[in-house]
Amino acid sequence: DIIEQDIRGPKGELIRIEMFCHGALCMAVSGKCYLSLNNLGASANRGACMQICRRGYLVKDKESDLELEIDNQYIMSPKDLKTIHFLNKTLDAGVRVLKIEGRARGAEYVKTVVECYKEAVELWKEGNGQWPIGDEAIEAKIEEWNMRLARVFNRGFWDGYYLGQRLGEWTHKYGSRATRKKVFAGKCTNFFKNISVAEFYLEATKEIKEGDELLITGETTGAYELVAKDIHDAKGELRTEIQKGEYFALKTEKIVRRGDRIFLLKVEE
């Protein structure tokens, strides 16, 4: 116990416990991996890991030249860590800094994950160190967080070693297992601030229809999700769908900027 042992940092203040709570896990201990550096000249310890461990590999017997394809798991690619369902236990234990692995992830990933964990921490604080709602209500809330976290990039989830598990869990699929995928549709060509309307050019996907879930991302805009409704074409006419190669306008609740990218969000089957 930090308080009982009076463990203090350089400034004489009690140190704060931090923990990695969510996101991609490296197969190596303490980041001591040189696969990327040795094979591609990109050092993981300088933030440039090419993650070649995430690929599929053949295992070859040196003596007999027998080859085996490991096709049911990616044996060097762990599932992503997720702790939100037992976050109250970690906070009760004294953790005060939560680390989220978000390197090279999209703005929608950062927004979603940070929002979920912030909501969980605020709920715990509201109850003065306990969940302030009943068991059924907190189970429903955790299920909601799990659903939202599953919609952004992930390789499947596990608890890590926090709850006593000794063997790691490996992903069964290359790339993301998110329940939704984003498909690039086009870019913002203009924004009319006085009426909060954004104009876009549909350059990639076949069509956008009324009711479609959309995502807008940009350096300053961050990540903004909306549902396509009241779609107007370049002539100002109301449409239920827009075809590739057309300009269209949507009313937005947030400021959108020229050059921002718009994506169509599709349920992954």
What are these regions (language model features)?
Residues 1-269:
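Surface-exposed amphipathic alpha-helical tracts and adjacent flexible/coil segments at the periphery
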